């Protein structure tokens, strides 16, 4: 009697099964990675720089964290797809105080341990998973120390990762431990207990103003921006040399006569019940702006008396309006990036000869930040046809 053979899978079939399993694990591991973004849309004739910032309605339980990627490439920030819950926003509009989970009490101490009160404090909006960009900022334009004789200090502003209070611990639920270790290593992490979402940047704004007023009362100037910007700190300090930190100043890429978006299909839709005026007050694009210590302290008080608004940079413009202050436009702050001129479609905009004449450029990856830093600060420096000082006047395209 002939024995029946067992069926065997050929090597190609085994390889296919293994690859399918690996792909499934990869997709499962990346399914929940999410982080807010503050990158603005393209500038239009009547559109504001939208940076929606909706407040959290619950204090997240940070003891039970959802899975969070902390390794590999920088996560791509998603845009919101769900409708803006204005009813929930209005019901929770008075909830604006959240505990500080990680602090840097000695960041601006003048006891000699940290070098005294800083001339420039750099505050960068970040999210827990974005270690790659934080490290790029630390090692390039955001490095602490003396720059042209000015003392520069740095902090990153974070909230609790989205979904951290919804339960479901996983293999990547160690975000709090990692942030605490990062804080011990660099002493530059500020973490609050509100959920860090696309809509919560206004909370980050008011909590930072309150923190800086309490822990950095003698700071001369503050630069506040996103983690995907490149800042030419020497140009910024050159601009600030002639400014008095005791006088009011808030300078950046200023947007005026921006109209609220009334189209319900837009993710930046603002109903008339929330804002009924035809235009927003003048405001500086949230990608990066600089303010004096005097203005910071006044803003901290004014913003505590202004109802929160779901667009953080517009909200800051409302606080300035309450103080009867006007933001100062500066052409070297490019929070919408460097536009490609229509007359020169082949012109390379990612060029150190352009960046050396600017203060802020928004919309760079971590790799681009590293590369531009090396191009500008390498041993040879940028080779440009017309070297000239920067941050002293309007930016012009060289022919």
From Swiss-Prot:
One of its GO terms (cellular component) is Golgi membrane. This is UDP-GlcNAc:betaGal beta-1,3-N-acetylglucosaminyltransferase 9. It is an enzyme of class 2 (transferase). Residues 30-399 are lumenal. The keyword Glycosyltransferase applies. The keyword Acyltransferase does not apply. Its main location: Golgi. GO terms for molecular function: hexosyltransferase activity. It is a single-pass type II membrane protein. It is found in: Golgi apparatus membrane. Residues 38-51 have a biased composition (Pro residues). Belongs to the glycosyltransferase 31 family. The chain crosses the membrane at residues 13-29.
């Amino acid at each position: 009697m002939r024995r029946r053979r067992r069926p065997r899978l050929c090597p190609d079939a085994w390889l296919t099964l293994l690859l399918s399993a690996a792909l499934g694990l990869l997709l499962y591991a990346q399914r929940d990675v999410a982080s807010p973004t503050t990158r603005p849309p393209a500038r239009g004739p009547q559109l504001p720089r939208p940076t929606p910032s909706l407040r959290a309605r619950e204090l997240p339980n940070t003891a039970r964290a959802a899975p969070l990627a902390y390794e590999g490439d920088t996560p791509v920030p998603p845009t919101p797809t769900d409708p803006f819950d204005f009813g929930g926003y209005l019901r929770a509009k008075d909830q604006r105080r959240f505990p500080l989970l990680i602090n840097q009490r000695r960041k601006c101490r003048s006891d000699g341990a940290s070098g005294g009160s800083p001339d420039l404090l750099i505050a960068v909006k970040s999210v827990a998973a974005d270690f790659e960009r934080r490290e790029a900022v630390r090692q390039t334009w955001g490095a602490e120390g003396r720059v042209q004789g000015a003392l520069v200090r740095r902090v990153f502003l974070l909230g609790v990762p989205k979904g951290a209070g919804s339960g479901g611990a996983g293999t990547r639920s160690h975000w709090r431990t990692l942030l605490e270790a990062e804080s011990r290593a660099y002493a530059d992490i500020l973490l609050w207990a509100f959920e860090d979402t696309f809509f919560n940047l206004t909370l980050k704004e008011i909590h930072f103003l309150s923190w800086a007023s309490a822990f950095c009362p003698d700071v001369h100037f503050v630069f506040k921006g996103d983690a995907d910007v490149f800042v030419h700190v020497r140009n910024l300090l050159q601009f600030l040399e002639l400014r008095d930190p005791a006088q009011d100043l808030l300078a950046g890429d200023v947007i005026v006569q921006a109209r609220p978006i009334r189209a319900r299909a837009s993710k930046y839709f603002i109903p008339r019940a929330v804002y009924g005026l035809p235009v927003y007050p003048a405001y500086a694009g949230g990608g990066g702006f600089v303010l004096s210590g005097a203005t910071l302290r006044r803003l901290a008080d004014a913003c505590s008396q202004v109802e929160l608004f779901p667009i953080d940079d517009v909200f800051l413009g409302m606080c300035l309006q309450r103080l009867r202050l006007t933001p100062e436009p500066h052409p070297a702050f490019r929070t919408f990036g460097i536009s490609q001129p229509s007359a020169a479609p082949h012109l390379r905009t990612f060029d150190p000869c352009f960046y050396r004449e600017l203060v802020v450029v928004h919309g760079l990856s971590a790799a681009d930040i590293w590369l531009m830093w090396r191009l500008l600060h390498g041993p040879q420096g940028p080779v440009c046809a017309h070297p000239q000082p920067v941050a002293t006047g309007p930016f012009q395209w060289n022919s």
